[in-house]
Design a protein with these regions (language model features):
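Active-site beta-loop-alpha junctions enriched in small/polar residues
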Residues: 39-41, 72-76, 104-107, 141-143, ...
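Glycine-rich, proline-tolerant flexible connector loops at the mouths of alpha/beta enzymes
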Residues: 70-89, 143
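Active-site acidic/histidine proton-transfer and metal-coordination neighborhood
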Residues: 10-17, 28, 91-94, 98, ...
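Conserved beta-strand positions in the central sheet of alpha/beta enzyme cores
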Residues: 70, 101, 137, 175, ...
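Soluble or luminal CAZymes and related metallo-dependent hydrolases
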Residues: 53, 84, 116, 120, ...
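Histidine-acidic metal/acid-base catalytic patches
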Residues: 2-65, 187-310
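Active-site mouth loops of central-metabolism enzymes
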Residues: 39-52, 107-117, 149-151
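Aromatic/hydrophobic pocket-lining residues that form π-stacking "cages" and hydrophobic walls in ligand
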Residues: 57, 88, 124, 163, ...
Length: 310
């Protein structure tokens, strides 16, 4: 499939996803903004090297009606987008879209790395402030053996309170993005420990529903209990599907049958086709009067995405 055809397919898929998602919210909810993650491009469409067709992605985001996107690959990808920050500002302004946040992380469970992570957080916060974003999505480090998770999480939480203070100096809030593929904060008990051990005034919650699903969490229960900690989240429907066959991606990469990454990607479903109570989540948001971004972080676009929406 040629790149132009693939981009058209992705655009059709994203537009339909946005329409389905917006249908779950009342038209009178101006406090919610919708974004998409650039991870869809960086993970499955673009090669690992060379200058990226970045403005093509921006066009798709504009044409499909999103308000903005989550910037992924920071800071290394800045050298590959084919423009400086001033030009990026112009390209965003021309399309009337925003950078909603960026993905951030580091070995927060290693005290010897804290100064380095803090420096990176200051740079990330400066970047976000320049683009008038107000949230930083933090990913946890790689997970150790389960026996050691509690201690590593304790160390990380001590740092995350400090990280919240650092970001606040720039008018930025930060919070945890749970991840089900080998990171420190995956399961329900780990999420709840993190939210218990961090200061709610300093460190918040940026969950991802597909990762909550893959970790077998009580998604509705978590949203009910911690809705007041939400500052940003990824809304993705999901249904488990083991990858039985080789999966060839648009960027030429191949996921061998039985891979965890391929199985995870196949588990991403169009809204209403999975097993997550999306309406229940939206009711909770309404009850707490949630204000902020909802990210449609569809991690995988199938070869013919249009067929599932017609």
């Amino acid at each position: 499939m040629r790149r132009r055809e693939f981009m058209a397919g992705v655009a059709a898929s994203l537009a339909a996803l946005r329409e389905r998602a917006e249908a779950m919210t009342a038209s009178t909810r101006p406090n919610i903004k919708w974004c998409v993650s650039s991870f869809l491009w960086t993970s499955t469409q673009w090669p690992d090297k060379g200058t990226l067709p970045y403005t093509e992605m921006l066009d798709v985001i504009r044409d499909t009606g999103f308000n903005g996107y989550r910037f992924t690959g920071w800071p290394g990808i800045l050298d590959r987008i084919g423009m400086d920050l001033s030009q990026l500002e112009r390209e965003l302004s021309k399309r009337n879209i925003q950078i909603a946040t960026l993905s951030f992380g580091g070995p927060a469970d290693d005290p010897s790395k804290h100064a380095e992570i803090e420096k990176a957080a200051r740079e990330a916060s400066q970047f976000l402030k320049r683009f008038r974003a107000t949230e930083l999505v933090t990913f946890s480090p790689r997970r150790p053996n389960k026996v050691l998770v509690r201690e590593h999480l304790r160390r990380a939480c001590e740092f995350y309170n400090r990280l919240g203070d650092v970001c606040a100096e720039y008018g930025i809030r930060t919070g945890m993005h749970n991840h089900s593929q080998g990171q420190l904060v995956e399961t329900q008990d780990e999420i709840e420990m993190l939210l218990k051990w961090t200061d709610p005034e300093k460190f918040h919650w940026c969950p991802d529903t597909v990762h909550l699903y893959m970790a077998n969490c009580d998604i509705i229960g978590l949203f009910q209990k911690y809705a007041d900690r939400l500052i940003f989240f990824d809304l993705v429907d999901a249904k488990y599907e083991y990858q039985k066959e080789e999966l060839r991606l648009a960027n030429g990469q191949v996921e061998k049958a039985g891979s965890q990454n391929g199985t995870f990607m196949l588990g991403n479903r169009d809204y209403g086709d999975g097993e997550i109570d999306l309406q229940g989540i939206m009711r909770i948001l309404k009850n707490v009067k949630y204000r902020g971004w909802i990210n449609i972080d569809h991690h995988y676009a199938r070869v013919s995405p249009r067929h599932s929406f017609d």
